[in-house]
Amino acid sequence: MVTASESWPQLLEQLLVGNVLSKENAAALMEAWLAEELTPVQTGAFLAAFRARDVQGSELAAMAEVLRKACALPDAKPNLGLVDTCGTGGDGADTFNISTAVAFTAAACGAHVAKHGNRSASGKVGSADVLEGLGLHLKAPLESVLGALPASGVTFLFAPAWHPALVNLAPLRRSLGVRTVFNLLGPLVNPLTPEAQVLGVAKAELLDPMAEALQQLGLTRAVVVHGAGGLDEASLEGPNEVRILENGNVRSDQLSASDFGLTLAPLEALRGGDLVTNQQILEAVLKGEAPDAHRDAVALNTALVLWAAGVQSDLSEGVKQALTSLEEGQPWHRLVSLRDALEGRKEE
């Protein structure tokens, strides 16, 4: 294990030649980052080295464990069988906020959703951006964040509010101008440590390491999905590659919208826009007033969440339940309920 500053060059050399860090060294590196023991040059070099080779699930899990322990949330967490819908972003597809719509739809179908999110990563508008635009208080007190779950079935955790230790790294990450290992860690460090998760990845080569990381972090059920057309959600365009974690084992599969009676559609049909446009799309989807492609994309991804959360054992039934909920506008009531619980803007 790395114990002294003079050992960091040797650790960097391991990464540069393609070696996998031990769990102990990966954890020590994260602890050093959080303690600001590394210079900006050293940190930049490590981030670039991780970018230059495929990161491993064991490395991600070890670093995520450190971040989870460092978060600002007390150990007391609700025992509700939580599920998260946070993904890596980075697909550059500029779709509307699908996973955000899924969070409220899944809640309306009976799941307890702890949505962990941030501002924009892949699109022009991140989950935090669009929810703030619709009146949610992103930095609500802990009692409000937790208190929303029993009544609303959903809560939102704004990542920077619960991971203050990462604030000092933010300027350097931005200055690098490229995505780093921290973009992969974000979906793994939900402060409420949900038992289940649906995690979208923008690149197929991330399916296995992210599934391995979730497995090592002890999740009960999870789905890691890489959508047709390069989407970090299940797509309507064609076959979607998935890794399914269940009973401690990971298996590979494919699923398509057409498997569930949904109409195939190109990515263009799911395009979003600026903040106002994405707010309008999200509101329309949740109220049951959206185009079929928007509705179907949300229903397909919601079915994965309902399976992971144990609400539905059959994906086809999950799609049907989600479609019914969307058509009745039930998810919008969940957003309004959460907005009120987080002491945001009241419905006029």
From Swiss-Prot:
Q: Which residues form the signal peptide?
A: none
Which SUPFAM superfamilies does this entry report, sorted A to Z? Nucleoside phosphorylase/phosphoribosyltransferase catalytic domain (SSF52418), Nucleoside phosphorylase/phosphoribosyltransferase N-terminal domain (SSF47648)
| The keyword Amino-acid biosynthesis is assigned to this record | yes
GO cellular-component terms in the record?
cytosol
Its pathway?
Amino-acid biosynthesis; L-tryptophan biosynthesis; L-tryptophan from chorismate: step 2/5
Question: Binding residues for anthranilate 2, per the UniProt record?
Answer: 173
> Which amino acids does the record list as binding anthranilate 1?
87, 118
- Which amino acids does the record list as binding Mg(2+) 1? 99, 233
Q: Which InterPro entries match?
A: Anthranilate_Pribosyl_Tfrase, Glycosyl_Trfase_fam3, Glycosyl_Trfase_fam3_N_dom, Glycosyl_Trfase_fam3_N_dom_sf, Nuc_phospho_transferase
Any single Pfam family the record assigns to this protein: Glycos_transf_3
Cite a single GO BP annotation. L-tryptophan biosynthetic process
Catalysed reaction equations from the record: N-(5-phospho-beta-D-ribosyl)anthranilate + diphosphate = 5-phospho-alpha-D-ribose 1-diphosphate + anthranilate
Keywords noted in UniProt: Amino-acid biosynthesis, Aromatic amino acid biosynthesis, Glycosyltransferase, Magnesium, Metal-binding, Transferase, Tryptophan biosynthesis
Cofactor(s) the protein requires to work: Mg(2+)
| Residue ranges of coiled coil | none
Q: What is its EC number?
A: 2.4.2.18
- Has UniProt tagged this entry with the keyword rRNA-binding? no
Q: What's a single GO MF annotation on this record?
A: magnesium ion binding
Residues at which 5-phospho-alpha-D-ribose 1-diphosphate binds: 87, 90-91, 95, 97-100, 115-123, 127
Job description of the protein = Catalyzes the transfer of the phosphoribosyl group of 5-phosphorylribose-1-pyrophosphate (PRPP) to anthranilate to yield N-(5'-phosphoribosyl)-anthranilate (PRA).
Q: How does it assemble?
A: Homodimer.
The record's comment on protein family reads: Belongs to the anthranilate phosphoribosyltransferase family.
**What NCBIfam families does the annotation carry?**
trpD
Which protein are we looking at? Anthranilate phosphoribosyltransferase
